[in-house]
Each structure stands twice: as structure tokens, then as C-alpha cells.
């Protein structure tokens, strides 16, 4: 089973409530996890995040204090935020508070194109109003947002007119999306970065009209997306750079400062996807490198090889990681080893806290998926002191 299928499998298990045999005491946190995170925080305004002068990390501006992204990709019981934020805003408020209490300083939110655009040049006012509300919530909880856009994870949420577009039309529509997002967010320091698209791919040859997804879906979701159907004779890496530059120009027309990145698939043949987005080539065109790495049992060396390929003179953030294809101990080993290259780390949150998992375990109702989420949250709390360091910024 592939890493991508494992991710879907986890969601299916969680949603279906398939039980696992997990003794109530299994995975019980030790003393390091028992310490409660402070329930309240000083009312200090968020500062803008920028790249450190040595290009190896991030700084808060203007204080120049170092900033280490440490947080979660946000979901709630397998749902996307647009599935419930208009009708159950209190769930978003609770989850953001809980992620902060677990020690997060960054939350990655995936914005579905079809929920934000009613037409190629017509934004959905309801979704943009909710995005503004999300910015205010993040500012209140002092959580930074990794806003990942152009998401087309569910076929049912993709407008037919969007998939019917040719390359030129679709790129223009994507530029409109990012221009509107940037115009909404430019005044808020709560935005850590704009992630232009999740796991983009440049095809090696011409694709049929409408085939913007690579048919890698499982359980109704597809996290990959082609950025062109007809690369022609242009090198795949050049197509990637041209696309990044087009989206960046759209953003910079409204927001001159917020960091920009792209959520990358691993760029080694052993991992099955050669996307055309090569870190050393796109590096000069983004603020930092974002990579998605799910270590595999017995193959930590491959995960580290992926990470080393990202060391191209820009900060490196592991934007997605989780013990899907390995044990929690192996995931922890990878995270600790990754500090030689990475300066930011985001796992996954799905709506429950350690207290919730303990209750489910006592009641013998903990599912396989929930047990995996619990193991990651335990690790997340335990490792934070080693990852969110306090030393002065390096110049």
C-alpha cells in the first residue's frame, strides 16, 4: 500500500470507527507528557514571519526572534474545514484552541478551489468572509496559518467548468484565486505562508482534456494535481518554474511580504512520483522548501535522502509527516534526525486531544486510526522542547 493510500486508509478507519485492540494503559504518556500546557497565553500581537539572513530558518519581524514552525495539518474526523465551518464554527474555535494547547504555533488549512470561486473571475463572498473570520481566530489564539490553495481533493467539489478549461484558462483562473486570497490576507500577520498548491505534478506527456487529477484517489480524495495538460516541448522543471512565477506575481500584486512555498512530493525515484518540481530548481523562486515525508518501516535512510535533496540554500519545512507507514518510534527517530536539515515540522490533527483519546481508551472504544493519532500527539507534546528552541537568531 502506498503512502498516499495509507493516509486515506487512516481516514477511512477513523470515520468508520473500526476498533483496534488497544489496552487502556497502552501508550500512556510518561512524565514528560503529563505536564499540562499553560491554559492561557500572554496577549501579544503576532509578528510577521520572515526568512533569516542565513536562509536556514525563520525570524519574527521586527523582534528578530527565531521562529520554528511546529504544528498540524488541520482536519476534523476526516472532514475538510469547508465541510463545517459555515454551520459549526464552534468546532473550528475549539480545535484551534486545542491545537494551541498541544503546543502548535502553525496550522495548515487547505482551501478548496471550488468552495472559494463561483466562476473563474467571481469569488464566493461567503467563503472569503469565513476566511477573514479564520484570520481573526488565528490572531486571537496566536496561531500562524499555512494557507494551502487550489485544492481539488474531492471530485464532487470541483466545478465542471474548472476541469473543462485548457491550460491558459485554468492558469488565469488560478491567478484570480490567489489574487483574491492575498487581497483578503495581506493585512494579517497570522499568515505564515501561502502554499501555492498541494503536491503538484507536471506530466511527462500530453493528457486528455479534463484529466487534471492523476487518478491516485482512494476513499474519494485525491491530493495530487497536474498544473498543465500539455507541457509541449518545454522541460517539466521549466513548466513548474513558470507556473510558480505566475502564481507569485498574482499574490505579490496584493501582498508584498508573506512567504510563498509549494507542498512537494519526494523527488527520488524510489518513492514513485517524479513531479517535475525539483527543489534545487524551484528553490530560487520560493521563500522556502516544503516537503511531505512519511517514513517507511526499515527505510529511514530513504526519508533522509529525500530531506537532504531539499537542502538548496532555503529554509526547509517538513509540511506533512506522520507514522502512517512506520511505528511511532521510527517516526520519532526520523524527526530527531531531520533537525540537521529541517527547521519546521507539521503533522496531522483530526479533532481529538490526548484527553479525548484517554477517555476512549478507558471505554475500550479507541479505533486503529485514533490510536495512531494519539501516538503522534504524544510525540508532538514530548518533542516540542527539542524542536521549538529558544536560542537567539543566527546572523
Regions found by a protein language model. Name each.
Residues 2-13:
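Bacterial N-terminal signal peptides that target proteins for export
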Residues 11-23:
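Bacterial N-terminal signal peptides
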Residues 23-36:
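Signal peptide processing junction and immediate N-terminal pro/mature segment
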Residues 43-288, 298, 321, 325-326, ...:
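Active-site mouth of glycoside hydrolases
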Residues 257, 301-324:
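P-loop/Walker A phosphate-binding loop and immediately adjacent motor/lid segment at beta-alpha junctions
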Residues 294:
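Short beta-strand-loop-alpha-helix junction that forms the active-site gateway
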Residues 315-395:
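Substrate-binding cleft of secreted/luminal carbohydrate-active enzymes
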